[in-house]
Amino acid sequence: MGKLATLNGILKDEASQMKLNVVHLCSSVNAKTIDLALLKATSHTSNNPPSDKYVTFLQSTIDTCYGPDTVDAILHRLRVTTDVCVAAKCLILLHKMVKSESGYNGEDSLRNNINHRTLIYTQGGSNLKLNDLNVNSSRFTRELTPWVQWYKQYLDCYLSIAEVLGITPNIKEKNEDKRLETQRVSSYPMDCILKQIDFLVELFEHISDRPKAPQSKLNKIVIEMTELMVQDYFSAIRLMRIRFEELNVRVAKPNELVPVLEKLENCKEGLSEFSWRSKYLIADFWYLVSKLKDM
């Protein structure tokens, strides 16, 4: 950051702090602490992603009575800011809030958090709104802006998948997680499984269409966005594989999958950058895609 931009950021953060003190004159200590942590996590004076210290604290509120207030406060800050970095940090925070449920417990875990998620995504409509961002304040913001715009659309897609699947797409490489999900999918009708696959493929397409990496290799905000996205990619592979295997058991030749498989293969090159992160998972998945296509 340049000296002028840094000074401007400091003044904005101090103004936000003063406003917070006035707003919370009659509020509870917990409400003020949440808003203060949000300001610290999304400060104007740093080009780094939200600090783990504040992220962990904000995540800890999600399963409490303050959870909706936390999500609503992040959404409000996202809507009113014109700062590209602050908007990026708000989106990262929202992504982490959604992913923060403890373990994978199927539909019940999502049902407990439904009020939090529906603050962001309700009945097909997204509450993720970007303000008119000050794009040209620096080279850093010019590089970051296309990522912020893409990431907002990506989160819309991610949340719509949670709506259709009935679970947050955050399944890990655990036998119990896969057993629970396989059991759920086995009870679904064919058209339901095909619809879910369509939405998962859309996530693949969004990942494949991400912006080019910034020339500044040390853009830690983009690195954080990418890391969260890759985690989602691996979860989506596990979810899709379970559905492909279920269809493979039910029908000899699932013709309805042909267009979907072609879309997937069109994404393959754009996703190859991440193959080294989980070679066996990736290789097994693309082998299954080829096998289904050749049936």
Swiss-Prot record:
Q: GO:BP terms for this protein?
A: clathrin coat assembly; clathrin-dependent endocytosis
| Main subcellular location of this protein, as a coarse class | membrane
| Compartments (UniProt record) | Membrane, Clathrin-coated pit; Golgi apparatus; Cytoplasmic vesicle, Clathrin-coated vesicle
Quote the protein name from its UniProt record. Answer: Putative clathrin assembly protein At5g65370
According to the entry, every stretch annotated as the ENTH domain falls at 26-169
SUPFAM superfamilies, sorted: ENTH/VHS domain
What UniProt keywords are attached to this protein's entry? Coated pit, Cytoplasmic vesicle, Endocytosis, Golgi apparatus, Membrane
The lineage, from the top, is: Eukaryota, Viridiplantae, Streptophyta, Embryophyta, Tracheophyta
Please indicate which superkingdom the organism of origin belongs to: Eukaryota
> What is the organism of origin for this protein?
Arabidopsis thaliana (Mouse-ear cress)
An annotated GO cellular component of this protein is: clathrin-coated vesicle
The yes or no answer to whether the keyword Membrane is present is yes
Which GO terms of the molecular function aspect are on file?
phospholipid binding
Q: InterPro entries, per this entry? A: ANTH_dom, ANTH_N_plant, AP180-like, ENTH, ENTH_VHS
Q: Which PROSITE patterns match?
A: ENTH
Any one Pfam family match given in the protein's UniProt record, by short name: ANTH
